[in-house]
Amino acid sequence: MATTNAQIYQQSQMPIPMPTPSLNPNINSAPTPGPNAMSVYEDCQSPLDTSVSGMYPGDRGSRVVSQPAPLLDQSHLRPGNQANLLSHDRTIELYRENAKKTNDPELIFEFSAFMIDAAKAMIPPEQEKDTNPSPALIKQMEKREEIIKEATSLLKRLADRGFPDAQYFLADCYANGIGTARGKQDFDRAFPLFILAAKHGHPDACYRAGTCCEHGWGCRRDSAKAVSFYKKAAVGLHPGAMYRLGTAELNGALGFPRRPKEGVKWLKRSAEHATEEFPHALHELALLHERGIENVVFVDNDYAAELLAQSAELGYAPSAFKLGECYEYGKMGCPVDPALSIHYYNISAQQDHKDACFALTAWYLVGSPGVLPQSDTEAYLWAKKAAELGLAKAQYAVGYFTETGIGIEANPQAALTWYKQAAEGGDKRAAKRLATGSRSSALDRRLEMEALKEEKRLGAANLAQRSGSGSGASGKDGKDGCLIM
């Protein structure tokens, strides 16, 4: 029986935790030892220096002003750098000693996977792009390569002995540029390993082999083979494979005729087994129940909202963004609730969903009594984040903020750069602003916007006073009248 919007609304008062991806989300289980698996460590090269001190970042310090503040900041709950009982280099050494001592293939596989995950975390992404690395960073990079080399060497030996999890994990490494020349994706090496693991019935490998056949990664494109692998993965209840079969049936892709009824069946099966990695079917079913398909899917906003909530709980940014809109504007039968709207927008924005970032800009411009304090600085920072993600209307907004001094010191020259980016992205207001070249109109618009913000704050406060509750009124009512949104 479908949950009502009222029930969803009550349940949603509990905060939804931000999803934390596991270090190794693709491995379901360790391989079963085989009869010839006792010499995996034979002929391995001598142990390497695998000290990985500083592998994990410690506590965040004070927030850099160039980044928007997280709305639900729980950084004070994080452990410090000394929270680990053992240093990571010591952990790797103990792992290695145990693996050598027992020569247990399962333990060796776990050790290899641990080393790969450790290597991934050794260097922050921003330092990866450093064109002039320091000697310390160069040493850390060399150490990381040594760890990856040892791990992939062990995985190769396990894969050669027929361990499907090792075959899949190594293929996944190659597909993501780990253990390859210059860190480039190597599907020519990955695809055969996906095939080997798929022959053992490995669901993830079947799915990945299907994607390779569909897109021609490491092989020629072959829709029939792709469907065959997807169906084999679906037998293993792989949600991604079931979702792809569903969308193919819905849209008439991969050689299927357009069969909405069959497509919906696959989507429902996928939704029943949705995970953080594959929540897509929940979102797609929600959209279908929002608009309906004649004689196939009936319109049911309550059920659609329930599906979106389930998907958002799994951390799917598009679902969280859509729920943010629903609770902002009262769509799909959801009550207007600024707190829930901001909450869901935040979940989405933390995953770099550009429209969600810009939605938070709008909320910060006007604030919400008892929920979110008004802040021009935060409005600017969220707009800047959305602009950097390529949203044209956010680029225009940043130009406007920069020109008129909202949340940042006024700088007309810097504003022109943002206007140009917005115009190139198709924003007509930016093109018009560049054509007129007049700053007076922008200043007039700022005065008008300040008056609009004050009007909204007063209106929201009056409504809250009449209703006896500060959470039932949106300080963002009439946002469409805002001159920059």
Swiss-Prot record:
Tell me the Gene3D superfamilies matching this sequence: Tetratricopeptide repeat domain (1.25.40.10)
What the entry lists under PANTHER family is as follows: CHITIN SYNTHASE REGULATOR SKT5-RELATED (PTHR46430:SF1), PROTEIN SKT5-RELATED (PTHR46430)
Lipid-carrying residues in chain (S-farnesyl cysteine): C482
Chain residues in the propeptide: 483-485
Cysteine methyl ester: residues carrying this PTM:
C482
Q: Which GO terms describe its biological process?
A: chitin biosynthetic process
Q: Name one GO cellular component term.
A: plasma membrane
The role this protein plays is: Activator of the chitin synthase CHS3 which polymerizes chitin, a structural polymer of the fungal cell wall. Chitin produced by CHS3 is deacetylated to chitosan, which helps to maintain cell wall integrity, anchor melanin, and offers an advantage during infection, as chitosan is less readily detected by host immunosurveillance.
InterPro entries tied to this protein = Chitin_Synth_Reg, Sel1-like, TPR-like_helical_dom_sf
Q: Indicate where this protein is primarily found.
A: membrane
Q: Does the keyword Lipoprotein apply?
A: yes
Null mutant phenotype reads:
Increases cellular chitin level and decreases cellular chitosan level. Swollen cell with abnormal cytokinesis. Melanization of surrounding media. Irregular capsular width. Sensitive to: high temperature, Congo Red (cell wall stressor), caspofungin (cell wall stressor), sodium dodecyl sulfate (cell wall stressor), Calcofluor White (cell wall stressor), caffeine, NaCl (osmotic stressor).
Q: Which UniProt keywords apply?
A: Cell membrane, Lipoprotein, Membrane, Methylation, Prenylation, Repeat
Concerning its family, UniProt says: Belongs to the SKT5 family.
Q: Which SMART domains match?
A: SEL1
- Please report the residue spans annotated as repeat (Sel1-like): 164-202, 203-238, 239-275, 279-316, 317-353, 354-391, 392-427
Species in which this protein is naturally found: Cryptococcus neoformans var. grubii serotype A (strain H99 / ATCC 208821 / CBS 10515 / FGSC 9487)
Q: What is this protein called?
A: Chitin synthase regulator 2
Q: What is the lineage of its organism?
A: Eukaryota, Fungi, Dikarya, Basidiomycota, Agaricomycotina
